[in-house]
Every structure is written in structure tokens, then in C-alpha cells.
Amino acid sequence: MGKKICVVFPGIGYHTDKPLLYYSKKYMMAHGYEIVDVTYGKLSGQLPEEIQKVFDDGWNKALDCLKTVDFSDAEDIVFLSKSIGTAISARYAAEKGLKVRNIYFTPLEITMQYANSNGIAFHGTADPLVNTGELTRLCEAKNIPLYRYKGGNHSIETKDILWNIRTQEDIAEKYIDYLNF
């Protein structure tokens, strides 16, 4: 039986110690996945104005982080990704020809240029970086289920702490169901 690998592609200011990635990563660890954290250091450019610059810089840093990871004998590969990390992870899977299950937290529109249909996505409707209607259309075209959280920002949070906690639980239930183990 091959190994199980989970690669975590964070966002720029949303690191793996924040709720969406923290709990999903803990879940993967509890199920025997080897965790590989992609780190970018300081990325050049700002979202959304310089998205291509940020994406290209993050892409190059992710390639460097993953150059020693051997996916060839993996029985299952899961990519957890957030924001710009969703675009980087989708491109990595596409260009490396990997069979990956993707969990996209707050994907950007650029993500859908590379994404395949093997994924699930979560989005806050008050996300200032993404047009909800356009993301919905792009996800539908790729057959990627998109769960929308009314009023949630780019972290899928609001000022209401209890709403945030209940939303984290709902998101976790959905990705646990998607992973099906």
C-alpha cells in the first residue's frame, strides 16, 4: 500500500495556523497523511492588483518547496489550498499530471484556468477579491461544487464569532464528506 500525501498551499496572509487550513490539516494528519507545507516567504506584489505577479512568484516558490516530494508511489494525494494557493495547487496538479483531490478554500478566478473537476470549493459572498457570480459560473463549468457562505469575507468569516464557528463546522462536514474516509 502506498503512502498518503496532503500538500497544504496557504494564501499570502492566511497561513496554516488559521482555522480553514488548521482544522483541515489536523483532519488529514489524523487519517495518516504525510503533510507537506508549501511556504512562500515574502511574495512580490499585492492582490488583487498584481495577481499575475503574485501567482508567478508563488508558483516558483512552490516548485522549489515540492522538488523533493515523490508522488509516484502515493495511493492518495489531497491538496488543501487557500486563496492564491488554490491557483498554485491547481496548476501544480495539472502540469505534473497528478491525480489529486482538491479542497479549494476561497479560490480566485485564476484558479479555474487550471482546475479539474476533482475538487470542492468554499467561498464567502462578501469576498472583496472575487466576484461571486463569476466564480459560480467558472465552478459550474468545471463541475466543481461551490459552497457559498452569505456575508463571509475572504477568510469566510464575519464579525459574528458564533457564525464563524458554525460556518467552520459546516465547511468541515462538507470536506469530510467529500474525502469520504
Task: Place the predicted regions along the sequence by residue.
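Serine-hydrolase catalytic machinery in alpha/beta-hydrolase-like enzymes
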Residues: 3-73
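Active-site nucleophile loop of the alpha/beta-hydrolase fold
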Residues: 11-12, 40, 103-112, 124
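Acidic beta-to-alpha connecting loop that harbors the catalytic carboxylate
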Residues: 12, 125-128, 150-153
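Gly/Ala-rich beta-loop-alpha elbow adjacent to hydrolase catalytic centers
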Residues: 77-90
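A conserved short beta-strand
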Residues: 96-109, 118
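Short, proline-enriched alpha-helix->beta-strand connector loops that line the catalytic pocket
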Residues: 114-119, 142-144
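Short beta-strand/loop motif that positions the catalytic acidic residue
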Residues: 121-123, 127, 135
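Catalytic histidine-centered segment of alpha/beta-hydrolase-like enzymes
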Residues: 152-167
